Amino acid sequence: MDRKESFQIDISTGYYCKGESILLGGAMLDGECVPDCYVKIPLKTMNRHGLIAGATGTGKTKTLQIIAEQLSENGVPVLLMDLKGDLSGLAQPGEEKDFIIERHKKLGFPYKAKAMPVELMTISNEKGVRLRATVTEFGPVMLSKLLDLNDVQSGVISLIFKYCDDHKLPLIDLKDFKKILQYSIKEGKEVIGAEYGNISSSTVNTIIRKIIELEQQGAEDFFGEPSFDMEDLLRIDKQGNGFISIIRLTDMQDRPKLFSTFMLSMLAEIYASFPEQGDSPKPKLVIFIDEAHLVFRESSQVLTDQIEAIVKLIRSKGVGIYFCTQNPTDVPETILGQLGLKVQHALRAFTAKDRKEIKQTAENYPISKFYRTDEILTSLGIGEALITALNEKGIPTPLAATYLRAPMTRMDILVPDEMDVLLNNSELIDIYEDTIDADSAYEILKEKIEAAGKKDHQEKIRKETNTIHRRRSEKSTFETISQNTMVRQVGRTLARELVRGFLGVLGVSTTTKRRKRKY
């Protein structure tokens, strides 16, 4: 048996699929496409996560497009996080250009152009379905990360969330959160301090300044209601194609912390809301995270551990996560080891550090008797990639240098008129377009404080009126004895009782307790 026949048997056996699969392209040997030697990925293993990596301009985005459109065609909804703004073309069919026809001639199957059902989404002022979350849903850990707080400040955030949970104060937007922070060091200082521990005014003021800074970056557009229902990511069109939801994040390039925290929050929400699914013929949802290095670059070790835990557990919910980045080393090893599909485009070696990273990358792939992995990594052309995946039994497939098929959809962006048509036909735009300003912590606390202030003011007027109508002789007597120490003490007691009356309206306990540690 010659080398080529041996290669054909290895690839055909390794990538054989009984069930549904997606076709990425044809396997190559010595730089040439081998006939009838296809690289297929079983749909049932697409919830085992994956990586698409490679230098700029080598075709990562087109590979993402190829996988996403075939998932959609097989009835699997897809969520794409688009930081570069070049994925909207999925909504339009591709064009049968000469180079595409020639590519498919080499592959041995005809090119097919097809548009996919696409929903454009946004967390900012870009056009699209508005994605929002309440501050409560975001949670104290994510919010602390977003605000870049230290441990002491994060502790205060957790305390405030606990207080709001216990007292049924909805935290919907940043306005609510600023209000409860101000309340914690003013009108509600004693009740919160007595029950949960005292809070330093300087710490709270620092947190409020950071929230204002966040608002200036446009974060107030993200927090609010109606919050997005994750079930709306799972829609199927009338033809049985899964919707491709594209979150437009082009204006997030200079705000990686907001993007990464949003992404982590969304993954956590999906994990919490989706039921257990176990092994199934195909995934319920597949998520692609473009520019993944931004996520991990901004993550503390604690948050990286959380991502690792989510990646490990979320596949039981039928969800696959795919990271797209320039270099596999951008993804922590603990997460890299959990990724079933690896698509590696060419890497460029300009420095000694680059060459070292290429050798390190080569070690992450199965040993092949047909390739020198570290050498082929630098010689792959545009639209070519090294691929290894998991077969239907969960066993790693042989390493295959693959000549990738062309996307069925447009390899360019939508023009403004096409985008407007797409948005006008959206079933979700009207549901999420307008912000709902329901009664929440801001309104509840404001009403509470105003009511307490009004009652205190009325009490003050009543006492002043009684004093004016006293007889002059009584007033003189009071003036005479007011210098007495006992009388002054009685006066202080009366004042303290009035304060208790005022604080009682606010629900504030004035019982003296042991002083608790300040945060």
Regions found by a protein language model. Give the residues of each.
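Conserved lysine of the Walker
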Residues: K60
